[in-house]
Amino acid sequence: MWGMWFTLVAVKLHVGCAMWTYAPWQGRYLPHSLSPRERLRAYATWCNAVEGNTTFYATPALDTVKSWAEQTAPDFRFILKLPKPITHERRLADVEDPLRAFLAAIQPLGERAHSLWIQLPPSFGPADLEALAGFLRRLPYGHRYCVEVRHRAFFADPRSEQRLERVLAEAGAEWVSFDTTVLFEDPPVSDAEREAWMKKPRLPRRSRALTGDPVVRYIGRDEEARTVAGWQPWVGTVAGWLREGRSPTVFIHTPDNVGAPGLVRRFHDDVRARVPEVEPLPEPVPSGPPTLF
């Protein structure tokens, strides 16, 4: 049913990074002179989506969220992570108050808050699926939801995988595909890769979409060629989703993330080579040389 709309509407692929400001990007992707409150506006000329990782650590102030909305186009996408007290500390139980506060805080984003991202801890396994199902049933309408699991059973045990898919499908929620296969193909060769090896989960590539809005998080290596070679299966998968009329959001990471904005645009170009109907990304704001004043 997805493919019937492909030729009738504009085709847009949303791509982005794990953050919108990062010191190594100053002067390379973002102008040196920008204040912190203007960096999202510049980032949004490179990418049309961003992971909302900061919301995991604290619910943002209303004025902060209003600033995010003012700096981005109406079709820019934030995939916002639910706060840690909801997912990790209370494990989805008795979370009405923090959830209500979070939803009120992000209201100024409107449709820019494209999906709310429920990242669950590695200890959240098949035995906890009833808690997840109950939580998803209680969530308000008007938002899209995507769930990231890290417990190995969901990837190694077909029965557990199918049970999780049923829970998500009943709620209309997506399964976030977090692909770390390239990161763990070979031993790390840089400090950033060694740190990523310690912190990131070993998860397989999972390319099955449950909804019309798939979410992919891909992490490569610090060597650009390794990262590009590793994402080739995703180019085909994402192109296929677009042809089916789905609307994916793809995030490109590397352990050091130094070249992430450029890699994001390269991935977008690779998909456009397969699906020429995809709209081009915005023209990036010139970063300019460093200045003394």
What role is predicted for each listed range?
Residues G3-F293:
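Residues lining hydrophobic/aromatic ligand-binding pockets adjacent to catalytic sites
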